Amino acid sequence: MTMATHDKDVTRALQGLEDGSSSVRLRAALTIGTAPDPRCVDKLVERCAIEPDFSVREMLTWALTRHAPDLTLPGLLGEVRSERAQARSQALHTLSKIGDRRAWPAITRELLSDADDEVARSAWRAAVVLVPEEERTELADVLATQLGRGGRETRLSLSRALIALGEVILPTLGAATAKGAPAARQHAIATERLLHDPDAAFEFAIEEAKRVVALGTPGQEGQ
């Protein structure tokens, strides 16, 4: 392929990212990811913030992972501070896929407790990928402040994030079980049960946790 032909392909793909058809945008992102070019990075990041189609957003993220982190991190780290929730969420999602721990300082307490559930969930997933070993316990303590939040999907996402940290979460879950609000206690108990039995259904763990909370703290049942 000549340089002139490649330049035309890049121009066509960049234009395709703004096409009214999601299938055209999907192909454009695939093309860029297949033949990475630094000139496309800014447009990929920009498009992530506004792309309405989930499949296209996933392809945009994939295309970004195909470029060198030195090229993608600056733009993505800027997006996590955006006022647009989708920009924050998709940037965090992409950072979790890239897995470069230089991004860790950008995962702030504010993002981990973001008012938007999608942003918070993306932040939780990114955090457990990027966190240094020596900060895992502190991260568990911050994540525990979100126990009991939201509906099923949000709670399951938080449980999975906590479980990904391993047994360092046990003291944190114990504290939440002992002193948390009822919803947080239920969520903490269910998360610990899933940690010990990964094959257990989340709904079953929650129902069991509700029963435990209703009867009293673990160890008090039947007294």
Q: Where are the language model's segments positioned?
A:
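Eukaryotic acidic, Ser/Thr-rich intrinsically disordered low-complexity regions
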Residues: 174-223
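Structural detector for internal amphipathic alpha-helices that build alpha-solenoid repeat scaffolds
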Residues: 1-6, 12-15, 22-37, 46-47, ...
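Alpha-solenoid HEAT/Armadillo-like helical repeat scaffolds in large eukaryotic proteins
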Residues: 12-16, 43-51, 75-83, 106-114, ...
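Ankyrin-repeat and related helical/solenoid repeat scaffolds used for protein-protein interactions
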Residues: 137-187
